[in-house]
Amino acid sequence: MTVKPEQAQPKPNAKSDILFIACGALAKETKAIIDRYGWSVELKALPAVYHMTPLKITTNLDVMLEKLKGQYERIIVVYGECGAAGIDAVLDRHEVVRVKGPHCYEMYAGADQFGRLMNDEPGTFFLTDWLLRAYEKAVLRGLGLDKHPELAPLYFSHYRRLVYLSQAPTEILIKKAQTI
């Protein structure tokens, strides 16, 4: 489901005038919402691993939006701010909107619940289904902890609590979350 920005060209007879561009970490849930409500919406997703280098989010969104210019009546971006400085400026330049929220954790928990979680413990590390499934690649290898486990305290010492925001929990994901 994820595409490279240069592959973003829609089919010549696109079935929808509306496109959602989602983060790969939100694509499965975005597709489920589209299907649940029977929306006539096309969905494209950028790789979730771009979060490891957030500049890739803004750069690749910009490239994708430029390639798709004039192809859709409306484009909605399903991304938070995600540490990607300038994402809103890119979207403004292309006259595109995004869903509200600083990151997917707030989208999954809801603004009120997320606010309570952060007020209760600002040092909270959040896990999602995607992050659990990709933990080894995105966190351990992505942060170099597979080769330098001694760096873990530098990355995680300020976290005091872990919250798993499950979208479609399985016994395997729950057990994995409990081991982290």
Q: Where in this protein do the model-derived segments appear?
A:
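N-terminal basic/disordered segments at the start of proteins
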Residues: 2-37
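Structural motif
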Residues: 19, 74-76, 161
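Gly/Ser/Thr-rich loops at beta-strand to alpha-helix junctions
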Residues: 21-28, 50-51, 76-88, 102-105, ...
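Short, aromatic/basic amphipathic alpha-helical patches
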Residues: 30-36, 87-92, 174-180
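A short beta-strand-loop structural module common to alpha/beta enzyme folds
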Residues: 40-57
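Short, well-structured alpha-helical segments in soluble
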Residues: 59-71
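Long, charge-dense
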Residues: 86-137
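A conserved mid-domain beta-alpha-beta active-site/ligand-binding segment of alpha/beta enzyme cores
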Residues: 119-178
